[in-house]
Amino acid sequence: MSFIDPYQHIIVEHQYSHKFTVVVLCATKVTKGAFGDMLDTPDPYVELFISTTPDSRKRTRHFNNDINPVWNETFEFILDPNQENVLEITLMDANYVMDETLGTATFPVSSMKVGEKKEVPFIFNQVTEMILEMSLEVCSCPDLRFSMALCDQEKTFRQQRKEHIRESMKKLLGPKNSEGLHSARDVPVVAILGSGGGFRAMVGFSGVMKALYESGILDCATYVAGLSGSTWYMSTLYSHPDFPEKGPEEINEELMKNVSHNPLLLLTPQKVKRYVESLWKKKSSGQPVTFTDIFGMLIGETLIHNRMNTTLSSLKEKVNTAQCPLPLFTCLHVKPDVSELMFADWVEFSPYEIGMAKYGTFMAPDLFGSKFFMGTVVKKYEENPLHFLMGVWGSAFSILFNRVLGVSGSQSRGSTMEEELENITTKHIVSNDSSDSDDESHEPKGTENEDAGSDYQSDNQASWIHRMIMALVSDSALFNTREGRAGKVHNFMLGLNLNTSYPLSPLSDFATQDSFDDDELDAAVADPDEFERIYEPLDVKSKKIHVVDSGLTFNLPYPLILRPQRGVDLIISFDFSARPSDSSPPFKELLLAEKWAKMNKLPFPKIDPYVFDREGLKECYVFKPKNPDMEKDCPTIIHFVLANINFRKYKAPGVPRETEEEKEIADFDIFDDPESPFSTFNFQYPNQAFKRLHDLMHFNTLNNIDVIKEAMVESIEYRRQNPSRCSVSLSNVEARRFFNKEFLSKPKA
């Protein structure tokens, strides 16, 4: 039996759009009528409008005092061929106050055949003749990638990274334990995960990454995935110009200095004015702006203030020769009227692509936020800076901005972010504003003269900036509501056909472990309605979508790593989530991840929460497939929790603390400390608090390196026993209907 990687042959169905090109050539004898021509010579321009496409209104430049203008300007419209598309042509006269309509004509696009190109004359007022050149073609190369497979760049990265990892594992594990690494195919895929938890997660993850870097574990990892606070550390690390040549130790020193300041210092009038003016520029270009944009700027100014122009795309240079693990970031797409615990689509971000695996739709990072229609960009914007994405990835804190800044009266609303979030519904997070303020279809024909328009825009800008500044620096009504604080971007799936849904694991028998029974799937971990509507599709008619912190559903980025295309063997996860006390069970987020995985038919080891009762609180727990022979595609999970146990006694693994000063620095609680220095809402870490949390997670990681090494050795053995791991035979494909028919009909070697 031959084994294949079938994902590249699964067809993600999508309908092709049409590209309608209009060249406005010229006009002759433009007139305002006999009386009008006596008073003024026309200043003509042409406006084109098709109501059925998002970027619907376009216009030529105007010519002063010209009755025979020659424009030769080309415009493109992306159209849905199933719609009744009608081009409306309006001849306009530019005036100082309000432009004047000289004539209107219409043209049914359906009268043209695909591949046809022709010149069409239009007569206005029985005198003026205008010539347009029109052509219609199929958009056969959309800007979205429709596929269940990983992108070619990630595939290339994986191949290069495996060669690097093979040598690193041999060095780390020694000749005896690595004798099974004969080729790149024998190399297990290791992923490192960081949870959310605000600056607590960021600081804790900084200690983790330092330990993984020093121990050589990081050199054996293919992926590093983060959520919320962990993404802030990943962004800081990967955007640093000296990484990876300079390791986390020196970069963490810079981080400690950056987070020692009160974030309120960033809200000086001069800086606030600069923030809001840059957001006005974004808003006036036609992009949505929310409080998350401002929060992203504050996070960026705190963590990456000397590289605020860095983009996600620019991080490719950090992995272009597979010298580092590939960073993966995440947020959620949510609906305005549905709880994020019931419905949420996971959006993944890498330096190579951004997209949603649930729909098999991906795009280059520089296109995220641009206007799309039917998979094609209709209006391209500049790539959003990394700090904007940092605000989106951690947007729970913009939703609860009053807690972050300590606005009066807000401190009594709950001691942890999780308690606050329990009271949030998506309708609190997301404004119900489905309209487009930049929607050309609602604009009147014509525009004001540029001089008059600039005066109006200046007044409008001043008013908007004033409102935003007052909302930001005062205890205004905006701080007493969570409305509209979610990130908002143009819907890149606008107009697509989602009649066919694609399970995250579209191949049967891919996960052969014992499946959950109905009672287990029905059992609630955190909420009776959790994941109830996760199979629902996105609204492809909504012009904008809301993107929020993934921690609002569960606080570990497992969905990125569990994609079967990535074939991860070993997951090392670090959970910095808040708990009621230091002695509380630490598995809530992991149990939610397990339930989500089972509902999506993805391999996941059985999480036994009673291990806490049997073994007590530990620095890490190992969860393995019960039957590796049957569950050959199930990963092993090493789950680190935030706990101060052995660190109190040892300053390094095996090195006891001796002096009172050494013992005192390590004698602290995480969640039981009444002063809450490690609160989820603490955005200022004095050096001592930073060092304590950083050094704790650095120690906990190093103290369990042997556990990680042992799991690596076992993963190598699993690979040896199952050389076809994460490959699938065609006879086991449940979703044959998704496959390219030509591929299915080919004879197999």
From Swiss-Prot:
Catalytically driven reaction(s): a 1,2-diacyl-sn-glycero-3-phosphocholine + H2O = a 1-acyl-sn-glycero-3-phosphocholine + a fatty acid + H(+); a 1-O-alkyl-2-acyl-sn-glycero-3-phosphocholine + H2O = a 1-O-alkyl-sn-glycero-3-phosphocholine + a fatty acid + H(+); a 1-acyl-sn-glycero-3-phosphocholine + H2O = sn-glycerol 3-phosphocholine + a fatty acid + H(+); 1-hexadecanoyl-2-(5Z,8Z,11Z,14Z-eicosatetraenoyl)-sn-glycero-3-phosphocholine + H2O = 1-hexadecanoyl-sn-glycero-3-phosphocholine + (5Z,8Z,11Z,14Z)-eicosatetraenoate + H(+)
Primary subcellular site in the record, as a coarse category: cytoplasm
Annotated segments matching region Phospholipid binding: 1-178
Protein name: Cytosolic phospholipase A2
UniProt: Ca(2+) 1 binding residues: D40, T41, D43, N65
GO cellular component: cytoplasm; cytosol; endoplasmic reticulum; Golgi membrane; nuclear envelope
Domain PLA2c per the UniProt entry, residue ranges: 140-740
Gene Ontology BP annotations: arachidonate metabolic process; glycerol metabolic process; leukotriene biosynthetic process; monoacylglycerol biosynthetic process; phosphatidylcholine catabolic process; phosphatidylglycerol catabolic process; prostaglandin biosynthetic process
Cross-link (Glycyl lysine isopeptide (Lys-Gly) (interchain with G-Cter in SUMO2)): K541, K606
Segments of this protein annotated with the region Disordered: 409-457
Origin: domain of life: Eukaryota
Pathway: Membrane lipid metabolism; glycerophospholipid metabolism; Lipid metabolism; arachidonate metabolism; Lipid metabolism; prostaglandin biosynthesis; Lipid metabolism; leukotriene B4 biosynthesis
Residue ranges that the Swiss-Prot or TrEMBL entry lists as coiled coil: none
The record's note on its domains: The N-terminal C2 domain associates with lipid membranes upon calcium binding. It modulates enzyme activity by presenting the active site to its substrate in response to elevations of cytosolic calcium. In the presence of phosphoinositides, regulates phospholipase A2 and lysophospholipase activities in a calcium-independent way.
Entry-annotated residues carrying Phosphothreonine: T268
Quaternary structure note: Interacts with KAT5.
Record-annotated active site: S228 (nucleophile), D549 (proton acceptor)
